[in-house]
């Protein structure tokens, strides 16, 4: 008897259909020789600290840290007990299990932690697929993998979970307790990924706040060759420039302008035209999709992930979204006709576009050597109904579809010309791009990347030694600009490119080869967590750090805020997933690191400024702002020993004193 274990009910129903498992049960579907059941994400979670000893329960205490479990314990989530009972019972009735959860590290953990917890001893196989359309399910069911092929992926997932738990439980408690000592009532959460991400935003905000605009200068001459006028920019000598090669000496600029106005002609020093061919953009990875959606529509990263997941799971119009790869395996070229047929079936208006595609053209996207666990996000062979998509879902689907269709269009060809000129002994340069063949770019229209900026001036034919007329010159006074604040897309890009934040060459090399901070599946959630914790705030499309977030980064040790070190842990998890590092070795290093951080944190005072707060009306101590069912209030930091509270805004409130006595009073406290 075989049991197919899926990650979610919709996935289970899709697979059950192919297996003839049509008989409905409570939390499962069954058929001849097979039963299909499902989790609902993680049904198990790491036990709370008090399970490892009552000394780790509430109230939190600094002296018992660090908490380093020797025997890790899982418990069934409170809201998952019913479905867990179903799976546990079914596992006792079968001798073979097919893991059919999502094809990634987290999907592996969801299934295998259940099998381990329930002590399943039978045979295990893996169903591995990147899409939930009919053809993909059929192909995967006919090619089940042995369990051993993905077992190391499970250990990597467990290592990630335990590492996050160790850092979160130990360091959040430590710094929250240290914060209370100086009047900070908030939970100062610390995370292996969230803290370096917060530090990235804090650093950018600091650069913006401390930025001082400086003037710089340009000279733009208007030249003409054979009657055709065009602009050319002065190239100042190095001694007149800052480190960015911007001229910062206005007196020199004025002299050059005057020189140009007194010089009627110049000479062409050199003129080169190069025909450049540009390939279509690759299929999307999750992070590149999040960046594009942020750029075009200002979508938060978590929203993009949710939409991509729904397009994959519910509508079945696109492939698996949590991928870090933009390439496709060569074998998938066989599916091109079916995919294009489904695209037209879903949106008949695309028939004229699809008719002009060259499906024999082999773009750079087809590359087996670049494939990771999953290929890029593309349309599936499933014909859907556009009318059932929300506006945001339709936008994301069309963007994914556009990148796939572009693979069958010609390369974009541009004639890029660069010419230099001598005007009175001064060097001037101009550049121009002329699109010779739009190729794939013709599909994009307004969806062309906003970042693509270039000089589109049409330059006349010219050659070295040719005379040019100087028709005029003007000085431009410009100001340096501060860096832009992060938004969801640019922060996702920064998390992916952690190498930009380190200077050590060896570490930079490692980070470039790795996926940066976090994973494709977790980055959006990290940003959302930082917002919910009050460390980041959304200002229109921008993400800005709050005073609390900046203060926290300022007082934490650099080992916690350094993106490079965090990315190294992800690199080691990749080694675990590849079977080159054991889970025990990974956890031993992680435990040693956490122990060092706890010891360091205990020995140093927390130099953080608490926000202004009213005094406790009972004991006179400090209070912290809390949120209750009826709004905010201020509670004594000596709680539960002292139960004094003050209503937010100083309104009349009942104050709970020591021993629970009621002390009606009116307080008018102004916070400055």
Predicted regions and their residues:
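Intrinsically disordered, low-complexity regulatory segments
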Residues: 1-169
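OB-fold/S1-family RNA-binding modules
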Residues: 49, 93-98, 138, 231-248, ...
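Metal- or metallocofactor-binding catalytic centers and their adjacent structured scaffolds
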Residues: 241-282, 564
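Phosphate-interacting basic helix/loop segments used at nucleotide- and nucleic-acid interfaces
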Residues: 72-97, 200-201, 292-293, 398-405, ...
